[in-house]
């Protein structure tokens, strides 16, 4: 609720900065909004029918430490963001992560884990041209071949991923789930 209220207030303020006109309708990309709504409905449906509970239970059977659990959750967003964008990866996997953390009795770690997942999604998405809109724009602007793009971005994405694993290992250590 708080985020919605703040967003609405900021939207109203922006109307005074850029007065509403006929162009406002063109700012809304209905197809994108429809796709995101459909994705959120699917994720909500998965949650309601217990898919997250089933997969989460299996995940918790496989990992024995918080470090392993968090690395797995962050890796989900890291790798999926390379192909489905960072935003879609987060919309898809954050509800799953929250459900798993609750099942593990670790809900107090939710903000930290979601923050690490967000970093992971951004680090993963920077590797590929389709990982985020900025990369698509840069690739189109420069006409750079995909393999060249990957070659340029791989050291940065790889280094950031290693640093993320180090942070997770230090913060969570070998604490049992």
Q: Which residues does each predicted region cover?
A:
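Membrane-embedded alpha-helical segments and adjacent helix-loop junctions characteristic
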Residues: 19, 23-107
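Membrane-interfacial loop-to-transmembrane alpha-helix junctions, especially the N-terminal start
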Residues: 1-5, 110-111
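Juxtamembrane and boundary regions of transmembrane helices in multi-pass small-molecule transporters
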Residues: 108-111, 115, 147-177
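Hydrophobic alpha-helical transmembrane segments
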Residues: 5-6, 33-34, 67-75, 89, ...
């Amino acid at each position: 609720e708080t985020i919605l209220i703040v967003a609405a207030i900021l939207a109203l303020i922006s109307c005074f900065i850029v007065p509403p006109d006929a162009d406002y309708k063109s700012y809304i990309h209905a197809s994108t909004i429809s796709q995101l709504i459909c994705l959120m409905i699917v994720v909500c449906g998965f949650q309601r029918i217990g898919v997250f509970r089933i997969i989460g239970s299996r995940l918790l059977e496989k990992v024995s430490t918080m470090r392993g659990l968090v690395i797995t959750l962050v890796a989900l967003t890291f790798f999926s963001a390379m192909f489905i964008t960072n935003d879609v990866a987060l919309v898809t996997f954050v509800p799953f992560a929250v459900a798993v953390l609750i099942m593990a009795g670790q809900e107090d770690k939710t903000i930290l884990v979601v923050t690490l997942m967000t970093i992971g999604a951004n680090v993963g998405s920077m590797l590929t041209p389709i990982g985020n809109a900025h990369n698509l724009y840069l690739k189109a602007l420069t006409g750079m071949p995909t393999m060249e793009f990957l070659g340029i971005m791989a050291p940065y994405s790889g280094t950031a991923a290693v640093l993320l694993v180090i942070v997770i290992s230090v913060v969570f250590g070998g604490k049992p789930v």
